[in-house]
């Protein structure tokens, strides 16, 4: 009996050690980043029916980020810096821009490293976060952008980028609009665990995921006006995560706009009000 208990004890220690090692390995090799940032086949030529300027912005040696500045036909009333959702390219994101361009906004957007026409490899979230700030700083130096009011716009994962961007450069912006954005990586990870019927293992998600975009912490640092948009029927980022993000914000400067419809599809269903939110941020 003693030998059995001793063997059981060592078996438990071995299993526990393997578990701890596995958690540390997944976390420090950033395996979850490979799940989040899926590669794509890209496309050869960017085309648009809008007036635009195509750019390739260097972020480090031999790596350039593909970006486009979409322009109205008249002098712009303001500039929107759009952080795209995880699977969005400049080909499909521009489908939302027409109402804003028609109002007189110019819109700048880029594709993350290693995705679509951007060069390099999307190694991890930290590098992508650094890229976003470099790109924003370069964007501010564009002649077409100087002396214009700037609004940050982020959708889904892009909303987390926008809030980090806004916290670090809030003196350069008039405000922020995010749609379908979660409050933290671990929280959205736990929701996907539930969807995959892995509820009993939700506890491990915060241990294996690096929370490189702690939106609920970054939003507390921002004193500029923020509009959080979230659909009550969002099947990809549950509505409650948008509520949690709002609960972490400065309520005096943040508006929570509840809509209905598909994930980050607000511009299609609520075009007039959506555009008005941008106009209000620049005092129009």
Where are these regions (language model features)?
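Hydrolase active-site cap/lid region
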Residues: 164-218, 268
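C-terminal catalytic histidine-bearing segment of alpha/beta-hydrolase fold enzymes
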Residues: 243-284
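Acidic catalytic loop of the alpha/beta-hydrolase fold
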Residues: 233-237, 264-265
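Alpha/beta-hydrolase fold nucleophile elbow
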Residues: 145-156
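Short beta-strand/loop motif that positions the catalytic acidic residue
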Residues: 222-223, 228-230, 234
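Membrane-embedded segments
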Residues: 60-138
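Short alpha-helix in the alpha/beta-hydrolase fold that links the catalytic acid
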Residues: 215, 224, 238-247
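An N-terminal hydrophobic leader/cap segment in hydrolases
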Residues: 15-58
